[in-house]
Design a protein with these regions (language model features):
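Conserved short histidine dyad/triad with adjacent acidic residue
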Residues: 29-45
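Short beta-strand His + acidic residue motifs that chelate non-heme Fe in jelly-roll/DSBH
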Residues: 59-61, 77, 83-89
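Tight coil/turn sites that cap or link beta-strands
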Residues: 36-37, 71-72, 80, 100-102
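Short, Lys/Arg-enriched, Trp-marked, Pro/Gly-tolerant hinge/linker segments that flank
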Residues: 125-135, 150-164, 169-207
């Protein structure tokens, strides 16, 4: 990396951290445990909320559906979504990260074919009130690094956190492109979406 590139990178990171309206990189970053069947909510907030189920299981109740999360799974609750949290029969421990959407708004990506990828505004919209992520250690580790940096606040931590947020957004984009199915109770719809994604390059005949 030459000097001009290095200065550009540092300048970009500095610009992002200085231009956050809230001046906060996160509002909640912690491990929290809940007793069996303990509930929290219902409530909603502007913040994007990411919970990694470190132990046990839990249920997230939305206005018109409920979604179960087990150990090792991740829930992403989008801004403005009304939700109620309920711990499972053995309780649960979560790694929580909550931050304002404006952080993601500083990152814009292009897809590999050169077109503009989905923006954070469309990705974290009402259509995706809750995103369920399974079997993705990479996303969990990035969330863990963000929480650790915010907790210990070592030198230059703000720059690292901004870069980790960018990595987190890329990994979420990748997950949504490769394996995500919208959370819904209609099994036929899930199968149809899965079929289309597997055969999108082929001609599909609708009957």
């Amino acid at each position: 990396m030459n000097k001009s590139t290095e200065q550009t990178l540092w300048g970009l990171l500095e610009n992002i951290t200085e231009n956050l309206k809230s001046k906060r990189l996160a509002d909640v970053f912690r491990l929290v445990s809940f007793c069996p069947f303990e509930t929290y909510g219902p409530h909603k907030h502007v913040r994007i909320e990411i919970n990694y189920v470190k132990k046990g299981n839990c249920i997230l109740h939305l206005d018109d559906e409920s979604v179960t999360f087990r150990e090792g799974e991740i829930m992403i609750i989008t801004s403005g979504s009304n939700h109620l949290f309920e711990a499972g029969s053995e309780g649960t421990t979560l790694m929580q990260l909550e931050f304002l959407p404006e952080i993601f708004s500083h990152f814009h990506f292009k897809s590999e074919d050169g077109t503009v990828a989905s923006t954070p505004v469309t990705l974290f919209s009402e259509e995706n009130r809750v995103i369920k992520i399974v079997n993705n250690v990479c996303i969990m580790r990035v969330v863990q690094r963000i929480v650790n940096e915010l907790e210990f606040k070592s030198r230059y931590y703000r720059y690292l956190v901004v870069m980790y947020y960018a990595e987190l957004l890329v990994l979420i984009y990748r997950y949504m492109d490769e394996s995500y199915l919208p959370i819904c109770t209609n099994d036929s719809l899930k199968k149809a979406i899965a079929y289309i994604r597997l055969n999108y390059q082929s001609e599909i005949t609708m009957q």
